[in-house]
UniProtKB/Swiss-Prot annotation:
This is Small ribosomal subunit protein uS3. Belongs to the universal ribosomal protein uS3 family. GO terms for molecular function: mRNA binding; rRNA binding; structural constituent of ribosome. Part of the 30S ribosomal subunit. Forms a tight complex with proteins S10 and S14. The lineage of its organism: Bacteria, Pseudomonadati, Pseudomonadota, Alphaproteobacteria, Hyphomicrobiales. SUPFAM superfamilies: Prokaryotic type KH domain (KH-domain type II), Ribosomal protein S3 C-terminal domain.
Length: 231
């Protein structure tokens, strides 16, 4: 079933963490969940040109900490921080907590599956040939160190009468291996012929127990799992 399930959801608690990290009482869970949805909708709408890949929401005591992962942090911050102050005020209108917004720069957007999918979708909307867009994205990812990448495009590709799916893959993408660091992204292209869906899987390598780089990606309190001895 690793072929069917969302690769990120399958690995939650193993080598990925949740995008919403907070605990709530019985009577507050629904309200906070709706706040998270509205905050994400607002930020994605306001930051369309900022290449936002991920929005993490944490709620320490009486605060709401929003971390925006963007490939173009200058667009988010604005001139002298004016834009981020406006965003903070608009987010504060949604939640009753004190809002803190942090920006994290994505230094290699070619290795982020969400940004790659959105880039291909934008090219399809500009009527770039889908095979050219897919091949360019694959070459860029492999050049920057990805161990494997797969891209699916489906819909009325090139304005064809009959919808179909085309895919391109290079390297290996082990969807069943839980220790594999597989990033997954989805985007939709709104063309004059209808909508086209874009899915991207990027394999960045395996995260092993003895790998010090894996410490940042593991959840706190997850040290009791059996360790794999180095060969």
């Amino acid at each position: 079933m690793g072929q069917k399930i969302n690769p990120i959801g399958l690995r939650l608690g193993i080598n990925r963490t949740w995008d919403s990290r907070w605990y709530a009482g019985k009577n507050e869970y629904g309200r906070l969940l709706h706040e998270d949805v509205r905050i994400r909708e607002l930020l994605h709408k306001e930051l369309k040109q900022a290449a936002v890949a991920r929005i993490v929401i944490e709620r320490p005591h009486k605060k709401c900490r929003v971390t925006i992962h963007s490939a173009r942090p200058g667009v988010v911050i604005g001139k002298k921080g004016a834009d981020i102050d406006k965003l903070r005020k608009r987010v504060a209108d949604i939640t009753s907590s004190d809002v803190v917004i942090n920006i994290v720069e994505i230094r290699k957007p070619e290795l982020d599956a969400t940004l790659v999918a959105e880039s291909i979708a934008q090219q399809l909307e500009r009527r770039v040939a889908f095979r050219r867009a897919m091949k360019r994205a694959v070459q860029s990812a492999m050049r920057l160190g990805a161990e494997g990448i797969r891209i699916n495009c489906s819909g009325r590709l090139g304005g064809a009468e009959i919808a179909r799916m085309e895919w391109y893959r290079e390297g290996r993408v082990p969807l069943h291996t839980l220790r594999a660091d597989v990033d997954y992204g989805v985007a939709t292209a709104f063309t004059t012929f209808g909508t086209c869906g874009v899915k991207v899987w990027i394999f960045k390598g395996e995260i092993l127990e003895h790998d010090p780089m894996a410490q940042d990606k593991r959840l706190a309190g997850d040290d009791n799992r059996p360790r794999r001895d180095a060969a």
